[in-house]
């Protein structure tokens, strides 16, 4: 069978299902793929077992089970992630293994919000999932309209507690199982849900459209031409003649102009997100720039040394620590291309953090580095990874 060509005319978004265990995340994922496939013949109809038996993957040394499902609506192509276990969600969201432009929060109408409902909303807030659409599931099991309204209010309040616009979030009431079984009324609810996702979750800005940034991996001098910084462009575009800043690991940001862009020894007019390049920098000496800094469009990212983060600590089985750590723990924080020592401050009431836990923490780095909300990092001890995290807010 010939491979289907990827249709680029539709915009693309990454989404996922979140919510408490057994509230119907996987059933909903199966229902969406099945109902949409039935209508358009595109994508693949996935059964519950195919999604639930997701293979384990290794992402930054962490074992995560994730199911990847794709489907399309009339206007968009979606990549959808669903995780079998709660721990998989935590790891997935913190490591960014599955980037989400928006999430469908599944809440059982029969049970209402539960502890993991709250935890997944908090995680979404901390790791920067920008939009949430709610699916109240199992509505076929609740015949009291007032009860449904009560659960909806509870979910909206919970979202507002974590700075999501609880009053404006779309809430769709349905039954994933009934839709999967082919009940037309409940299939209609799946279309209603996907219309809400299409409309409420904006198309993400592509990496190439964002302001330029490239982590510096290596630096060398070319006699008679100047200093070259190499690395993979993380976002945006850069062309000859652009002014860039050199940020991190030093008191002052350096400013310079890109006088040449090379890829595979060929000169380019410009480079964009995903390209591995060498950038020739005007008037910069070999000592002015080092691995671990970033080149960026002036004024778009700033160096910081203190931030709050959401962190997952590797379990012993994943090659992590065998013992807990306490406040004032001083590991290395690996950002993009370099390690920086930092001091950990734990939240009030948290005495210690065990391997396999996830926690919020405050980190104080010994030197500044270019970071912003949503920047990912690893925590390392002597070169081995013991944790993974994401910056949730900047302090200074």
UniProtKB/Swiss-Prot annotation:
Q: Which UniProt keywords apply?
A: Cytoplasm, Elongation factor, GTP-binding, Hydrolase, Magnesium, Metal-binding, Nucleotide-binding, Protein biosynthesis
Give the EC class as a word.
hydrolase
Q: One MF term in GO for this entry?
A: GTPase activity
CDD domains given for it?
A: EF_Tu, EFTU_II, EFTU_III
Record-annotated residues binding Mg(2+)? 26
Tell me the protein family, please. Belongs to the TRAFAC class translation factor GTPase superfamily. Classic translation factor GTPase family. EF-Tu/EF-1A subfamily.
Give the protein's recorded name.
Answer: Elongation factor Tu
Q: Which species?
A: Bacillus pumilus (strain SAFR-032)
């Amino acid at each position: 069978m010939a491979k289907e060509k990827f249709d680029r005319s539709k915009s693309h978004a990454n989404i996922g299902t979140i919510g408490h265990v057994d509230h119907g995340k996987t059933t909903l994922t199966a229902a969406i793929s099945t109902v949409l496939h039935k209508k358009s013949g595109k994508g693949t109809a996935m059964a519950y077992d195919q999604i639930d038996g997701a293979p384990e993957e290794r992402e930054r040394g962490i074992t995560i089970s994730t199911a990847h499902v794709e489907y399309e609506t009339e206007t968009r192509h979606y990549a959808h992630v669903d995780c079998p276990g709660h721990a998989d969600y935590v790891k997935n969201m913190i490591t960014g293994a599955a980037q989400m432009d928006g999430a469908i929060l599944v809440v059982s109408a029969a049970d209402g919000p539960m502890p993991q409902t709250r935890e997944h909303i908090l995680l979404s807030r901390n790791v920067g999932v920008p939009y949430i659409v709610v699916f109240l599931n199992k509505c076929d099991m609740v015949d009291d309209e007032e009860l449904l309204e009560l659960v909806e209010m509870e979910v909206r309040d919970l979202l507002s507690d974590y700075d999501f616009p609880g009053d404006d979030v779309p809430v769709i009431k349905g039954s994933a199982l009934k839709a999967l079984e082919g009940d037309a009324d409940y299939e209609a609810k799946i279309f209603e849900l996907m219309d809400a996702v299409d409309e409420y979750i904006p198309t993400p800005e592509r990496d190439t459209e964002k302001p330029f940034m490239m982590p510096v991996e290596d630096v060398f001098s070319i006699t008679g031409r100047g200093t070259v910084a190499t690395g993979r462009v993380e976002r945006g575009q850069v062309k000859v003649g652009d002014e860039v800043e050199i940020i991190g690991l030093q008191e002052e940001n350096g400013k310079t102009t890109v006088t040449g862009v090379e890829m595979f020894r060929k000169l380019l007019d410009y480079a964009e997100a995903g390209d591995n390049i060498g950038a020739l920098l005007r008037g910069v000496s070999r000592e002015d720039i080092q691995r671990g800094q970033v080149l960026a469009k002036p004024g778009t990212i700033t160096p910081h040394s203190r931030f709050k983060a959401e962190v997952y600590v590797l379990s012993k089985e994943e090659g992590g620590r065998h013992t807990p750590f306490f406040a004032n723990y001083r590991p290395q924080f690996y950002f993009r291309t370099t390690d920086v020592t930092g001091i950990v401050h734990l939240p009030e009431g948290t005495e210690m953090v065990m391997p396999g836990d996830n926690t919020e923490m405050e980190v104080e780095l010994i030197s500044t580095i270019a970071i912003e909300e949503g920047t990912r990092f690893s925590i390392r001890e002597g070169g081995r990874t013991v944790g993974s995290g994401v910056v949730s807010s900047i302090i200074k």
